[in-house]
Amino acid sequence: MSDAPRADIYDLAVIGGGVNGCGIARDAAGRGARVLLLEQGDLASGTSSASTKLIHGGLRYLEHREFALVRESLAERERLWAIAPHIIHPMRFVLPWTKGLRPRWMLRLGLFLYDHIGGRRALPATQAIDLRRHPAGVALKARFGPGYCYSDGWVDDARLVVLNARDAADRGVDVRTRTTVIRLARADGHWRIVTRSKRGEETVHARAAVNATGPAVLDLLHRAERPTDRHMRLVRGSHIVVPRLFDHGFAYFFQLPDGRIFFAIPYERDFTLIGTTDRDHDGGLDHVAASAEEIAYLCEGANRYFARSIAPADVVWSYAGVRPLVDDGSARPEAATRGYRLELDGGAGAPALLSVFGGKITTYRHLAAEAVNLLKPHLPMLQGGDWTAHAPLPGGDFPMTGLADLTAGLARDYPFLASATVDRIARAYGTQARVWLGAARNASALGLDFGHGFTEAEAAHMVTREWAQTSEDMLWRRSKLGLRLDRAQVDRLERWLEERL
């Protein structure tokens, strides 16, 4: 699917359809560039959909003295909430104090800094709590008493990527998924890029290129014959999803005796998301999965805190992603910096190649703005500065505290939808839900129901407006309905896709 007309040469080719690549493509298009976005798989099919689903400052990074990164991340937290209040929500996190681990003075100091260095405005401040009286204490073992409650944000990470791509396409970006870059080389003052897709091999040309391929950044540089002294550290983060362990909206920040931390987060109404691990990854990137050891580790960690025990057999879904971190020589993978580096190759008549090293979801927008600023001397059509801080993503054009009102409006206008379906739709599409719900006055107007309120109208929207091509794209990235649909329902969806595509 392409939303831009063909021409002989693009101003900018962005290689990589994760959050950084889509963010850069959107920003550059909004400043006047003609952009091509190339992704070898589905949007967000790599690291960007395998996060802990948080928009956060990174409380644990204070321990590693990454004050600048935490400050930047905290500042971005409320900016992102404001431009995408349907897929980003404030969340309160409960941090129990655990005897023998980090002392209370250290936790208080860290939380004080967390509250004050990032320009917090709308989110509530940290509070000291007594877990013997606090609602979040009910699910925990009785030995936990003192604790703290602080603010951060939750995000639907894959939809964040898709919405950046959608907005980019609306601004003229040519988005091509399932398109592999097999060769790229400088030729006649521009980049000559050879791609392979179901359409066969094609050659495109661009005045500048961005390498936003995440864990494959060094591989692409090698193919472009542009060596770098930069070293990457690939760190695997694994997560598990289990049936709901608690009946409230708080999340948990837990410490472990090995010094690591992990989260337990309310997830998709009926589940709890637990993660993450930090393990150096030396395998391939095509099929990254949580190991049995990591799954057991997360279960054991949860069992140190929750009154109800879980085992690997309770895990209904697990996933893992490889984080492409800048190798700063840290002894332990969890201590490696989550900051990013932008490396520009080009000048003196040579077309620019900008490579992205590292980064985290929370800083993607700021990274994109900085990347486009670096490209301005090479692309004179780029006009203006950072514009994305106040430009809503598709569906996010409503007040940042207005999700409940938006949901109520959908429930009123589409009374035939189940309340759980209305809630899911509001949190996925925001104001854009009405684009595909349209004037429907009954369920049959939305076509087939594949299960749990997932209708033909919604599936068609994913295909025509969100680049979905497979059931996995729909059920595990555009939504998380894969947690609910059974095999027969998935088969029915796949038959529908075969007929349509």
What are these regions (language model features)?
Residues A29-S49:
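Glycine-rich FAD pyrophosphate-binding loop
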Residues M1-I9, G200:
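A short, basic/flexible loop-to-alpha-helix module at the beginning of a structural domain
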